[in-house]
């Protein structure tokens, strides 16, 4: 499950396609052909479908395994947690076995949040208070958020999902000309 942020349009654009998990042996195992799978041996890299499910294509012996995230979308924190998987005998009449990871509970990816800050100065390099600054998506025409520069010219946007944005003045203080240069 990916954390979503509708305001910034993150988590609803097939970000799951960037998530992969490794399927590892949690104990030394012997395969049907006699080969040994070592502890922490990577057996397969699995991609997620649009529903967040993965399919293990390898034939594996009964035993203890774990999955661990190998890659994720750039907006999210890559987890180093190991999620246990137990593969027990289900009867020889069962051609396909469904394995539950993390006791069947969803694995959640947490978003990376950042702060964007800057200084507004006049043409002489002096701090400029009262400028309205907008934060835009790189292809956006309307600001996602706005703020006003403080007495020392500083401004900031906090709790912003990691990504690429444009910062631009959208209203100048009285007596000044607006600088709409995108940064």
PLM segments and residue spans:
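Solvent-exposed loop/turn and edge beta-strand elements of beta-rich ligand-binding domains
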Residues: 1-183
């Amino acid at each position: 499950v990916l954390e979503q942020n509708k305001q910034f349009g993150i988590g609803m654009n097939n970000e799951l396609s960037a998530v992969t998990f490794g399927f590892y042996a949690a104990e030394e195992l012997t395969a049907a052909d006699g080969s040994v799978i070592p502890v922490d041996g990577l057996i397969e890299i699995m991609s997620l479908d649009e529903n967040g499910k993965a399919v293990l294509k390898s034939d594996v012996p009964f035993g203890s395994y774990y999955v661990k995230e190998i890659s994720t979308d750039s907006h999210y924190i890559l987890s180093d947690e190991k999620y246990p998987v137990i593969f027990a005998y289900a009867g020889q009449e069962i051609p396909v076995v469904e394995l539950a990871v993390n006791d069947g509970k969803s694995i959640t990816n947490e978003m990376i949040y950042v702060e964007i800050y800057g200084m507004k100065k006049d043409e002489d390099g002096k701090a400029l208070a009262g400028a309205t600054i907008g934060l835009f998506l790189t292809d956006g025409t309307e600001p996602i958020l706005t703020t006003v520069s403080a007495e020392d010219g500083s401004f900031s946007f906090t709790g912003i999902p990691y990504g690429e944005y444009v910062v631009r003045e959208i209203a100048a203080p009285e007596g000044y000309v607006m600088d709409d240069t995108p940064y």
